[in-house]
Amino acid sequence: LCSLGDGPFGDSATQYFVGSFDGKKFICDNQPNVTKWMDWGKDHYATVTWSDAPDNRRIAIAWMSNWQYANDVPTSQYRSPNSVPRDLSLFAVGDGIYLQSAPSPELLKLRDISKKRSFRVNGTRTVKELVPGNEGAYEIELAIRNQHADVIGFRLYNDKGEEVDMQYDMKEKK
């Protein structure tokens, strides 16, 4: 893993290399024209991993901030937190080996209230409260069956007017 302060997504980014290391020399298996990124956002930096986790797992956590605005973020609540712990593993596609990550299973112990909703959306749908009375963190699991949209997404917002948009481009597959 290599953290960059001048990445292609708007500053902070983490690039990774796959290969073999004999204790002295690293031989990179990446094709020269392929750059591999750990995350597609600009708030993933200074990744730290642990190799001695149970079951020989590789767990990573990153700093979620960006020097373009790190000093302008308010100092309360959500300033420059760490990412959720992720289990890292490699998988092969064609002639390349890639990194995948998934939230570490220990996070399941943090779950409390669960509420499931199922509905169809044609255009826009607003859900006022995900879990009434919850003022903490949310975990959202989506199963989306798309029939016609080029881009799908959702927006989370609060009473203060703060919002986060998530989008997925069906054609680009990202």
Describe every region a protein language model picked out.
Residues L1-S3, Y16-F17, A46, W50:
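Short, well-ordered alpha-helical packing segments
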Residues D6-F9, W67-Q68:
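Short glycine/acidic-enriched loop and turn motifs that connect beta-strands
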Residues F9-V18, V84:
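Structural motif
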